[in-house]
Amino acid sequence: MAHFVVNNFTVETILSNIKSGSIAIPEMQRPFVWDSSKVRDLIDSLYKGFPVGYIITWQNPDVKLKDGTKSVGKMVLIDGQQRITAMAAAIVGQEVLDEHYKWKRISIAFNPLEEKFEVANNAILKSSKWISDIAPVLEPAFDTFSFVMDYCQKNEISDQMSQINNIINRLRSIQNISLGVITLDSTLDIDSVTEIFIRINSKGVVLSQADFAMSKISSNETYSGNITRKTIDYFCHLLESPEDLKDIKNSDTVFASLPEFDAIKWAATKSNPIYKTTYNDILRVAFTYKFKRGRLADLVSLLSGRDFETREFKIEIEEDSFKQLHEAVLQAVNQTNYERYLMIVRSTGIVRKSLIRSQNVLNFGYALYLALRERKIDSNEIEQIVRRWLALTILTGRYSSSPESSFDYDIKRFFSYDDPTEYLKLTEAGELSDAFWKVNLVQRLNTSVASSPYFNMFLVAQVKGHDRGFLSTQVDVESMLENRGDIHHLFPKNYLTKNGVPQSMYNQVANYVFLQQEINIKIR
């Protein structure tokens, strides 16, 4: 049995459905990643009748309302967002956001004499042979006859009036071009939809479950999902590009007037290279801590109103899930929470991002911190639990593979006890037993990879212990990590080589030590 249907819709119909909200396209409010030349090429392909690829939508499940009736689920666009945004920009004249959150127009010009498209520029604007912007030509009320008369007169080609008229009509017919739209069935779960996307997508672009979740969030304006998404997006962007605060404020005045904007604008005033979060990170942290689950597929189900017991989709579950997620996101972007967590991270000895190989170590640590605060655990105890858990997860590589399963398992176990410390103690006893220290760790030190988590943990421990660098009298390891330091062989390389020790032995991390650069130069 097929889990999808294929229909053909005209460009005009698709853009109309986007405008009416029948198809949700959340990316319209996010930076447009295509350059203008790609927009030109897309319009050129439509004009020439070349295929431009399928548009893929996912029919959201029908939701059971409180009165027992059902609301038909909205279609969410999961592939084709850039193409549709490009068509809306060129054909309808819709502005797009650039990477700095500034609105701009992409004007595609057309030369009827050469039947050629170009991105509008100053030379084109001055030329009578070019239509500097095709959007007005594609409007329903456009007067083709008057335009052709005027165009031919300006360019002294009255004998080509019939030909130019046909070309302009062909240009206007772009809106009638049919595109294939694949609609995935509402019964498919998010894992299946992800797999389908990966198999269909010729470019091999992996659409993550966070992408699905974010699309689901922003497409629901009824429960302010669009505000939740903007809170996440803008916060993460400001951490990376604080100089864009003013542009965001000017380009989205409605959001700038909301308390959510006040809650995130602090991110433009702080710079912290240790924990710069992406939308994936904030979404995972907020979901894990608030819902005590780790699989983002479950978040999509909850936001669709799924009752995991009855397997029905209920409006009250959908409403409550959006409300809880919004609250969780505000806690995750809260300045006090964020900075206090970073203080714990630094007090653990983690003073540089490179000391952690997996961002998910910090993500779970933050989710755990927020969840413990919500449980109203004593602040000193929270710090101890989080520090110990960070150390454990770095040493064991706990979130290096299958992080969602590990997140789900750990967050549920932590809060299945009246005292969350119990799960920490049990995990330490199992994962960091005498066998780990006497056998496993010793074997894992048999590596020459300087980014080894075990060597990194050694540096973390040195920072925690305020140790000075090797052969240093004043400068500590923390200062060298934050500024400039070198890795050197504890037992000199030349000495070991002369005594027959092979490279595979003398380059092991157990023979590495961190020291000042100038001392390293003198030793050489």
Q: Which residue stretches match the model-derived regions?
A:
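Short helix-capping/linker segments at secondary-structure and domain boundaries
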Residues: 95-96, 203-207, 370-379, 463-471
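Histidine-centered nuclease catalytic patch
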Residues: 80, 477-511
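Flexible loop/turn segments at secondary-structure boundaries
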Residues: 62-65, 493-498, 522-523
